[in-house]
A protein has these predicted regions:
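A common structural junction motif
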Residues: 29-30, 75-77
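Short S/T/G/P-rich N-terminal loop/turn motif that feeds into the first structured element of a domain
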Residues: 1-70, 84-99
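Short, conserved catalytic or adaptor-binding loops enriched in Gly and charged residues
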Residues: 78-83
Length: 99
């Protein structure tokens, strides 16, 4: 089973500074995330609100996701990247029609 995680939040800094911080941290943690089961990581930005952030990750392991996301380093990362707590939701695939 795959788990899709959505993260919606307000960036604490302007986009350029937030991107640098995000890319530095995710670059440094990519191997650990992949080892824990993170298959994909994608960020979307709102063209009408430069502080809006929407991320989608796909995980192969719920246990790996929970361990990685609950680590002090990732909690610190979220605290520095976002104003307040972002909305984080875990979703599972359905057998509904797709295209």
């Amino acid at each position: 089973m795959k788990y899709t995680v959505t993260i919606r939040g307000k960036l604490r800094e302007k986009q350029a500074a937030a991107k640098k911080y995000h890319d530095d941290v995710t670059g440094a943690t990519k191997d650990a995330a992949k080892k824990a089961g993170d298959l994909t990581h994608v960020v979307y930005l709102d063209p009408q609100d430069p502080q809006a952030f929407f991320g989608i990750d796909t995980w192969s392991s719920l246990e790996g996701l929970q361990a990685f996301a609950g680590s002090p380093q990732i909690r610190e990362f979220f605290g520095k990247l976002f104003e307040g707590d972002p909305e984080v939701h875990v979703w599972v695939d359905s057998d509904w029609n797709k295209w």
